[in-house]
UniProtKB/Swiss-Prot annotation:
Keywords: Hydrolase, S-adenosyl-L-methionine. Catalyzes the hydrolysis of S-adenosyl-L-methionine (SAM) into adenosine and L-methionine. Does not have chlorinase or fluorinase activity. PANTHER family: CHLORINASE MJ1651. The keyword Hydrolase applies. Its EC number is 3.13.2.3. This is (R)-S-adenosyl-L-methionine hydrolase. Adenosine binds at residues 18, 82, 181.
Length: 263
């Protein structure tokens, strides 16, 4: 089986991890990519999307990838939020219908962005080919695969019928931005109430404590300055906010707290 070729992928690799920037992990991944590309006289822009994903939080990572990747030209995107590294979980390359390549663990991390971009192929990475350590597949597998995609203008291997998707049977908090806005995994097409309706939302914290809040469903933040609001954000998810205030702190909300619309 030969290499599956493309001629329109750009020499861009993005990195998204939960590694933070106080350690050398991100630097090791970048160094590995650059070393491989140098051997083939290739160059690439390595762009950091975020390394501040909450540790082990696949939901958070999935949302952040959605907010950034679709706005790049066709390119390579390596993501590592991998709490079960070294286990039997698969590693994959997703080629999208629009020419993007997504590289990382098959644990649901690419759920949202693959859904938006459309899946053309899902390719299983043969991890043993890369002789990885048991704890750092970001450096030993995913960085290498990302570089190989640029060198070969594609990636080849065993194709899979499906990928793992995150569990969305429960509605929950998947992101809290720097303004304290609370982003849930409730999507626009699941919302049945109308603009300017007042709705009741139950928040169930991970410790089992529940609270019910009242908020107005609006189109933008400024429309209600005194009370909590709900809106559909720019990525099509229901968001709980308070104008020029930090809703997450006011409500003591954290990642993965459960959300229920009770009207």
């Amino acid at each position: 089986m030969g290499i599956y070729m493309r001629d329109d992928i750009l020499d861009i690799i993005t990195l998204t991890t939960d590694f933070g920037t106080n350690e050398g992990y991100v630097g090791a991944m970048k160094g590995r990519i650059l070393n491989i590309l140098k051997k083939y006289n290739k160059d690439a822009k390595i762009i950091d999307i975020s390394h501040e994903i909450k540790p082990f939080n696949i939901y958070h990572g999935a949302y952040v990838l959605l907010t950034a990747i679709p706005y790049f030209p066709p390119s390579v995107h390596v993501a590592v939020i991998d709490p079960t590294v070294g286990s039997e979980r698969k590693s994959i390359v997703i080629e999208t219908k629009s020419g993007y390549y997504l590289v990382g663990p098959d644990n649901g991390l690419f759920t949202y962005v693959a859904e938006k971009l459309g899946i053309k192929r899902i390719i299983k990475i043969d991890e043993e080919r890369y002789k990885p350590s048991s704890t750092f597949h970001g450096r030993d597998v995913y960085a290498v695969v990302g570089a190989e995609i640029l060198i070969n203008n594609g990636y080849d291997g065993e194709e899979l019928d499906e990928m793992v998707k995150i569990d969305e049977t429960k509605k929950r908090v998947i992101h809290i931005d720097r303004f304290g806005n609370i982003i849930t995994n409730i999507k626009k097409d699941e919302v049945t109430f109308k603009y300017y309706d007042t709705i009741m939302i139950k928040i169930r914290h991970k410790n089992g404590i529940e609270k019910i809040i009242k908020c107005k469903f609006v189109k933008s933040y400024f429309e209600e300055k005194n009370n909590f609001i709900c809106l559909i954000n720019s990525e099509g998810f229901l968001e709980i906010s308070k104008f020029m205030d930090n809703a997450s702190k006011l409500l003591n909300v954290d990642y993965l707290d459960e959300i229920e619309i009770i009207y």
